Amino acid sequence: MMTSSSSLAPRPVLGAGPVLSKAVLSAASRLGLRSRHLALVIGSSEASISRLQHGRALDPASKEGELALLFLRVYRSLDALVGGDDEKARVWFNTLNDHVAGVPAERVRTVEGLVDVVQYLDAVRGRL
């Protein structure tokens, strides 16, 4: 039985940009972040976040994309630490934490704070 070469061609895969956009919007929603707050986290504007919500893709190599990837690391690490419990994650994210020198939700609004929170969560996960 012969197979045409077109049936052997790889299927197109969803690009990294749309996947990153969808993931960062989902993580922000699960942590209770509003568009304005997410815009600060990824160094963007509220209008840009609105465009993301309507299908615009983030370029992973852009400044916004790199910050979005760091924010996803925060979410993924926190999700693993709380066993997938979004309510516990939201409580942790919005509670004063001496180890990150503030409230994580506020700290992630700056690049330095975002990196500090990522490093803290990575260290905590590393001890488990």
Feature locations, PLM:
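Non-transmembrane "mature" sequence context
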Residues: 1-128
